Amino acid sequence: GFYFLKGDGARLEHALIQFMRDVHREQGYREVFPPIPVNSRSMRGTGQFPKFVEDAYRLGGGNDEPYDDDDLWLLPTAEVPVTNMYAEDILLPEDLPIKHQAYTPNFRREAGEHGTETRGMVRVHQFNKVELVNFVEPGESDERLHGLLGEAEEVLERLGLPYRILEMCTG
């Protein structure tokens, strides 16, 4: 579930995070450092709730108790607060595209799920990541998706890591 990084491991993680933040800044992403606790309204607004409520860490209460809009949860992904920065806004075409990156620790209870698709993976309840969030006009979403793929590939290529791209059905 949880782990310590010490010495070289801790330095390596910090270096990789900084490297990715620098690369994405070069790619035109604006950095955001969002809050770690988020409210239920934000979780619902990004599709995390009700589907993933059992995977979330609630602050000050159990997941089996009813929750209201103001209850707080540990961040499952930076997408929740970053997209909710615009929850009350109308984004006009001239404001787009908007490209944000956010480094955050993330918390999920799903660590116990195992199966053939997770063979060889170690699942944990807390992990760090640099998230990319893009807002574009609907007609540009496919092009932006391919742009995101290229931006992720650039990180892997600059690190000299081998990779492959899989096209998978999610529906």
Q: Across the structure, where does each feature detected by a protein language model lie?
A:
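TRNA-recognition modules of translation machinery and tRNA-sensing kinases, especially anticodon-binding
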Residues: G1-G171
